[in-house]
C-alpha cells in the first residue's frame, strides 16, 4: 500500500483551528487509511492508503476534516519520492553554516504561473533568502524567524496558491517516518 505524507495548512496556529492529533489520526483511520502517524501539532500525517489518485485523496481528507472539526484547511500531499526530491533540491544544502532550524520549506498546492513566480523572485529579501524550486519555496532566515522581514504568507498571496510551511527538521523527520512506514510493507 502506498505511503503518503499530508500537511495541513493553518492547524493549531495561534489558537486557531485546533485539532488534537489523536482525533486527526482517528479521522484518517475512518477514511480507511492505515498506520496513520502524526508529527508535531501542526497537522503532519504520514499514512498508508490504497488511493493512488492524489487530488481525490486530498479532497477526501479536506471533506472529512470539515465534517469532523467544522473548518476546511488546505491539505497538501506528497509521496515519499516527492519529499525525497524536495530534500535533494534544497538550494542551501551545499552551503556551510546553514542552520536547519532557520530553513523553511513552503509547500505549494500547485505550480505558480510564470508571472507570479517572477514577482516573488523579484522581492528584495536581504539578509533572508528565497529560492523557488518546483512546487516548493525554500526560505532561509539567518537571523531567525522571530522577526522576519520576509513573510511567506505575503508570498502566498502573491502566488495566489494555498501553501503551508515546515521547518527543515520537520521535513527530514517526515521523510524518515515515511521511509520507516514504507519498509513495513
Feature roles, as predicted:
Residues 2-42, 46-185:
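Surface-exposed, charge/polar-rich loops and edge strands
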